[in-house]
């Protein structure tokens, strides 16, 4: 188990001439933040291995998951437009600790089919 975020590497699940699919660990920014202490991020790490890699979307710092990066400006535009047009299906899963409520049929868990926040 990593002892510090600097020990957490991006895992590349797919790379070709058009795009990268990276597994971003929780605790790592997708893009640089404000301040010198917030420059370590997935996009900077990806650019070290794949110069010119371009951000398509972001994941919250506390979220681990798949991050798409484009290898060309044309691919970045196309993928960004697909996200904007909601053509990309996203799924989120949570790992919880403690007791989970009964199934939806019994008044417990189910699917949420709403945006996380208003656009």
Q: Where does each model-flagged region fall?
A:
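RNA pseudouridine synthases
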Residues: 1-119
């Amino acid at each position: 188990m990593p002892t510090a975020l600097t020990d957490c590497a991006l895992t590349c699940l797919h790379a070709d001439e058009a795009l990268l699919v990276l597994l971003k660990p929780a605790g790592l920014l997708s893009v640089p933040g404000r301040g010198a202490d917030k420059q370590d991020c997935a996009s900077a790490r990806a650019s070290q291995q794949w110069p010119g890699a371009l951000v398509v979307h972001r994941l919250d710092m506390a979220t681990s998951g798949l991050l798409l990066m484009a290898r060309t400006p044309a691919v970045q535009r196309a993928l960004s437009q697909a996200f904007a047009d909601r053509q990309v299906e996203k799924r989120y899963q949570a790992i919880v600790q403690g007791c989970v409520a009964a199934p939806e049929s019994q008044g417990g868990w189910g699917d949420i089919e709403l945006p996380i926040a208003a656009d």
